[in-house]
Amino acid sequence: QYARLLGAEGDYSGARAQFAILLELEPNNPDMISTAALLDFELELYDAALAKFLQLIALEARLDEAFYYVGRIQAADDRYSEAIEAFGSVGPSREFRDAKVRAAQVLIDTAFASDIRQFFDAQRRTYPSSAEQLFLLEAESLRDWSGESLEAYDRGLAAFPQSFSLLYGRAMIHESEGSLWAMEQDLRRILAQDPNHAATLNALGYSLTNRTQRYEEAAVLIERALALSPGDPAIMDSLGWVYYKLGQYVQSESLLREAHAALPDPEVAAHLGEVLWAQGREVEAKDVWQEGLNRVSDHPIILEAIDRLGVALP
């Protein structure tokens, strides 16, 4: 108990010393080995941590945790094939998702998109009950290669045609590629199953606002989303933005100020600044934009707005 208390209070070195004593008494106790290994990992004593996690594997105890940390240590040591094998050995558990994401990242850094598919194909054969999640992780890991990512979403949806997460993810890829019709079709497939899916209502409404002039339709969608998720700053931002497009500046400013107070995100700042600018309140607009750029100096939405409006910031 004393050793665990030291660890809980952040005294990892003291806790490690206490667990070393305890392990001399019970050298094959999985709980003690696990805690001692995690302490070593926190203290960046990776060789010692690796030895303990490998001991857990030999004891066939806490396997998912052990394989996960073995993979992390080996990846940091540039032992990529061993890291991928370790991450691949993590079964459904709290470490499952992050292990597969880390394996994909190793493959992205060292191999090709085809290797990522092979890895996830093998994972789906090994863990068929997690196949839907694995399709999603594969597609997300390939997002910088939109063609390969779309292909992974397509394969996933062929197996799980009603999957909200796969439909939503594919819709966002379509949106980023400018394929508005395809994006809208996927989002409406979700809404056909669940008309009250607030995130999808908001995503569709916001995309229609930015990509079309269907502002009234967009406003109806986003208003429904906000009614379902009152106080959500992202949805308030979307609604404020479509109200701006409709020329309803007072309502727009009120929503955007509330959203900005709750979520001081540069994209919200871009929208609020533009609404203020449209009302002739140029100093206030510049202050809001500058605040956003202080957070993210090269934020594309703010930079696009001030360039389009011909604004010079101090």
Locations of the language-model features?
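Register position in tetratricopeptide repeats
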Residues: 8, 42-43, 76-77, 109-110, ...
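Structural marker of alpha-solenoid helical repeat scaffolds
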Residues: 25, 59, 90-94, 125-127, ...
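Canonical tetratricopeptide repeat
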Residues: 1, 35, 69, 102-103, ...
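Residue-level recognition of tetratricopeptide repeat
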Residues: 4, 29, 38, 63, 72, 96, 105, 130-131, ...
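TPR alpha-solenoid repeat register
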Residues: 32, 66, 99-100, 132-134, ...
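Canonical positions in the second alpha-helix
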Residues: 21-22, 55-56, 89-90, 122-123, ...
